[in-house]
C-alpha cells in the first residue's frame, strides 16, 4: 500500500510521512501529525496500545479517519455467502459465525474516538472481478489467511469458486462496492 501511495500524484509531497511499522510501535521522530488514516485492519490492532501512542504524537486538532469496506454491497450471492461463512468461519476459528458480533468487533476502535461523523458510500458503477481473483482476495482477510487455512485452502477455494460461478457471467462477477468512513478525535482515556 505504501508503494502504491507513493506512486500516486502527490505521493512524494514533503508534508507526507510514510511509515512502515506496526501501528502500535511506529517511531516517534518527525514531530506531531495532523491526520491519521487507518483501514479495515485496525480491528486486528491492540487498541489499548495504539490509541495512547497516536494521541501522544498528535498535533492539536488531530483527526483520526478509519476507512473500512471493500465488500460487495448486497450482491446476488449474499445468502449463499452467508451460508459459506457459517460453515467456514467455525472450521477455521473454532468460533461460530455471528455477523452481528463480527460487525461490533469491526467497530470496537470507536470507543477510543469522539466521533465527528461517519458516512457509507456505495460505488456508482459495478466493479468487475474474475471469480478466481475474488476468491484469492479472501486470503487477505485474517480469518481466511493461507496460514490459518493450511491444507484446507484448496477445498476453501474450490467451494467458494463453485458457489460464485453460478452468479458469474463468463467467469466475471459484477457488484457494487460498499465503503464506510468514520472520523473523529482520539479520546483521553
Label every PLM stretch briefly.
Residues 18, 26, 44-45, 68, ...:
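Tryptophan-centric aromatic hotspots in well-structured domains and transmembrane helices
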Residues 56-128:
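Conserved catalytic/acceptor-binding region of the Class I
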Residues 98, 102-189:
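Conserved Class I S-adenosyl-L-methionine
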Residues 14, 30-31, 175-177:
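Structured loop/turn residues at beta-strand edges in well-structured enzyme cores
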Residues 24-36:
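A short acidic, Gly/Pro-enriched loop at the edge of an enzyme's catalytic core
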Residues 35-39, 47:
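A short beta-strand submotif of the Rossmann-like class I SAM-dependent methyltransferase core
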Residues 44-57:
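A short, conserved alpha-helix within the catalytic core of class I
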Residues 1-27, 49:
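Class I SAM-dependent methyltransferase SAM/SAH-binding core
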